[in-house]
Amino acid sequence: MKHLRKIVSILLTAIMVLAMCIPVMADGVTGGNGYTITAPDNGHTYDIYQIFTGEVSGGNLIKEKWGENAKNVNSTVKKGDTVPSGVLQALEAVSQEITHTDSEQLNVITKYVDFNSSAIATITGGQSTGALPVGYYLIKDVASTNTNNNDAFSIYMVKLLNSNITIQPKVSVPTAEKKVKDVNDSTGITTVDNQNSNTEWIDSADYDIGDDVPFQLKGTVAADYDRYTKYKFVFHDKQQKDQNGASVFNFKPDTVKVTVDGQEVKNTETNKYYNVKTTGLSDGDDFEIEFSNLKQISSVHAGSVIIVEYNATLNSNAVIGKGGNKNTMHLEYSNNPEQEGSTGHTPDDTVIVFTYQTTINKVDKDKNPLEGAEFTLEKFYKNESNGEWRSITKVNNGSSTVFEFAGLDDGYYRLTETTHPEGYNPIGPIYFTITAEHELLSDNPGLISLRATETTEQHTNKEAGSITFTSTNEDDGILTTNVVNKKGSLLPETGGIGTTIFYIVGVVLVLGAGVLLVTKKRMNADK
């Protein structure tokens, strides 16, 4: 019989999601003493189900008999009986329809497999079956002992066994990444990675405490997406905590925006495509963006890019300096087309947000601490008009000579002495810039350099030299400078000794001039 000729050449080849090496067979009828199937050493376990046995002629199975694990919903199956022509014709029909997906084709084939029966063989970790007769076999990926959770199960595989074969799985899993955007408040310029991908979405940024930080989550759908009838897709987001367990970011659910291949997706009253979860979470997550069934979005396909953008406010729990404030995500996804609810997840991906501090020491000309001063620090924010200066809250450290301003990022600043020490001259506003360099694309981005420089004009980078910022520890992210006040000059007052001296000196000079004048006239008269 030649009913399975096209099943061999089209259906079974198309359905396979495992590539298997098959030696070229000589023409003619073969039965053989049996062949083996070997499992890869990948932590997975495979059950082998025998559907048909028979002989091979010209690369096709003939004289088909029901196998050990066969069934037929329309009649009783007895191992070794001839397979009815109607069954073979049904299989050939589905193989000829190229519009059928792999899952649809498998739905027809699995009608003839009794999964309640004991598999003819189970193999794992490089093991091989014993000699199996020529026939059609279904291979089921049933279990995994992998500690790597970024793993998936293969769909059922159907194979004509007419040689020794080794299973070579081609499993597809999604990819995921997290990014952050870095915007300079004072210039309005967004950092771009010009050396790599020319993207504004990078792995590190710096922000002021109180700023809204823009984040991006991205997931790419796996290549075997069409083999699933239901597909779970969940972004898990975890924010760094301080020593008391409080988050350094405040997530803003109302800023969440979802796109699929660049097109925004919005929940409606009748269709809720995703859920923003902030309660009832596990594993220390702060929130989740859950697509319980991605199939609800009809435009999604294998390779689709799902992007979630949101803002979170950097709060007063933030870590100052090189340690930074980490924000981590991973993607949970369906990983077994034959078992709903089975999921894997991608490795964690982390971005870091840095913030810094300036410390102002009030001193006299001899660098001794000087009490009696008060300072206001402001930052310049560019907007659609001419920009504006916004005050920065001083840290209450209990000192009257050391002024700390924490939670700063790069930009233009103005330091104003609002009260000067008694007996000392006041100083004018001091303008300075903070500049920082951090790794833009890295699995563990770090702070490279941090400096602050006084400027002679507001919001320019022209350097002056009246104050100098230093950092005693490059890791702590603190920039320190001394601001010096000098005592006022002593000026003469009316009625004081200074006035008397002036009078005496004046009289002496007048008398002296008169004597010289008289003497000169007499000398001229004598001539």
Tell me what each language-model feature is.
Residues 2-527:
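Solvent-exposed loop/turn and edge beta-strand elements of beta-rich ligand-binding domains
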